[in-house]
Amino acid sequence: MKRANKFKLTLLGVGVLGLAACGEAKEEALTYPSVEACVKAGVTDEATCEAEFTKAQNLHNQVAPRYASSGNCYSDYGYNRCYQNRMSGGSVWLPFMMGYMLAPRGGSVFTQPLYRTSGDPNRFYTSGGGRVGAATADGRTKVAKSQTRQPRARTRTVARGGFGRRATSAGS
């Protein structure tokens, strides 16, 4: 096969994958910056709002993006939006949890922490970097079905070099 044909096939494959991602099924979810906002919305009761917030906080410690330095974290999430978390194997920098998402899943509720980036501080993002759509006044939004799956625990730390260096990721 000629080089040009391989290139066209590659572009076609990328295009199909891109369209598949755009057409991903959406599910309704609830997003809130705090327990108080969840309670005020009136969609669920206070006990549920508190319990799901606690679940999101616990999950945050496992799935939050990890950084080797404050500067790297601040670059992605904004100045003073990160904190140092000392662990048995050393310490890492994590972004603050800025909200949480509740998504009905069968007879239960799936919950995960949400973050705000420095480049888009008015939107929520999942720990995997998925952008969460704008919510209505009561917190309702539509998210890609893939964003309502359990995020993977983070075992890697992001580190970036200076001018002319590459970003690296190391297991923790």
Regions found by a protein language model. Give the residues of each.
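Low-complexity, glycine/proline/serine-enriched intrinsically disordered segments
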Residues: K2-N5, L11-G15, G23-S172
